[in-house]
Curated annotation (Swiss-Prot):
Catalyzes the phosphorylation of the 3'-hydroxyl group of dephosphocoenzyme A to form coenzyme A. Pfam families: CoaE (PF01121). Transmembrane segments: none annotated. It catalyses: 3'-dephospho-CoA + ATP = ADP + CoA + H(+). PROSITE patterns: DPCK (PS51219). It is an enzyme of class 2 (transferase). It is found in: Cytoplasm. GO terms for molecular function: ATP binding; dephospho-CoA kinase activity. One of its GO terms (biological process) is coenzyme A biosynthetic process. GO terms for cellular component: cytoplasm. This is Dephospho-CoA kinase. Residues 12-207 form the DPCK domain. ATP binds at G20, G21, G22, K23, S24, T25.
C-alpha cells in the first residue's frame, strides 16, 4: 500500500482466524516486534457504545429493546439480536463498516503511515478488506479450544459462540485463502516463534 503524498510505503497485513483462536495474542506479539496494530473490532465498538454517534440508526434497525434503562445501547443485547438474525447482522454491518473503514483510512494516513501495519479483522475474507492488504494471515487454532476460550473470556454460552461462528467462513476456508498461516496449537512460546518467523519474512518483503 503506497502513500502517494510522502512516497513512504505502508505495508498492510490483514490477520484473521476463528473467534477465540488467538488473533489478538498474535497481533500483540507482532506489535512488540515492531508492527503497528489496528483492531477492526475496537474501531467498530465505539458505534455500539453508550455514547454511540449512530444511536438513532441503531434503534431504527434493531428496535428500542437494545436500550438500557438510561436509554443507552446495550452491546450484549445487540449481540444477542444480530448473531441470531443474519439479515439484521448484515444490515448492521452495512451501517457500521463504512464508518469503520473511514476511521481506519484516517489512521493509515496519519499515525500508521510508512509502517508495517497488522490489521486484525475477524471478517477479513467475508468482506473486501483482504483486497486492501499487501499480505493476509490466518491463525490456525484448535476449534474446540477456541470455543472454550471464548466462553471463558466473554462469559457467554456455547450456543452464543456457535451463533457467531455460523456468521463467518469456516476456519478451513480462511486457511486456504491466506498468504501465510500462524499455527496456534501449542503454547504461547511456540506462537511467539511462529510470529517471529512471519515478521522476518514480511520485513524482507517490505524493505
Amino acid at each position: 500500500m503506497q502513500n502517494s503524498d510522502s512516497g513512504k510505503k505502508t505495508f498492510l497485513i490483514g490477520i484473521t482466524g476463528m473467534i477465540g483462536g488467538g488473533k489478538s495474542t498474535a497481533t500483540k506479539i507482532l506489535e512488540e516486534m515492531g508492527c503497528f496494530g489496528i483492531n477492526a473490532d475496537r474501531l467498530a465498538k465505539r458505534y455500539t457504545e453508550p455514547d454511540s454517534p449512530i444511536l438513532i440508526e441503531l434503534v431504527e434497525l434493531l428496535g428500542s429493546e437494545i436500550l438500557d434503562e438510561q436509554g443507552k445501547p446495550d452491546r450484549k443485547k445487540i449481540s444477542e439480536i444480530v448473531f441470531n438474525n443474519p439479515k439484521k447482522l448484515s444490515r448492521l454491518n452495512q451501517l457500521i463498516h463504512p464508518l469503520v473503514r473511514k476511521d481506519f483510512q484516517k489512521i493509515l494516513e496519519t499515525t500508521a503511515k510508512g509502517k508495517m501495519v497488522i490489521w486484525e479483522v475477524p471478517l477479513l475474507f467475508e468482506t473486501d478488506a483482504y483486497t486492501l492488504c499487501d499480505a493476509t494471515v490466518t491463525v490456525d487454532s484448535d476449534p474446540e479450544e477456541s470455543i472454550l476460550r471464548t466462553i471463558s473470556r466473554d462469559k457467554v454460552k456455547k450456543e452464543d459462540v456457535l451463533a457467531r461462528i455460523k456468521n463467518q467462513l469456516p476456519l478451513t476456508e480462511k486457511l486456504k485463502r491466506a498468504d501465510y498461516i500462524l499455527r496456534n496449537r501449542g503454547n504461547i512460546d511456540s506462537l511467539r516463534e511462529e510470529c517471529k518467523s512471519l515478521y522476518s519474512t514480511l520485513l524482507g518483503k517490505m524493505l
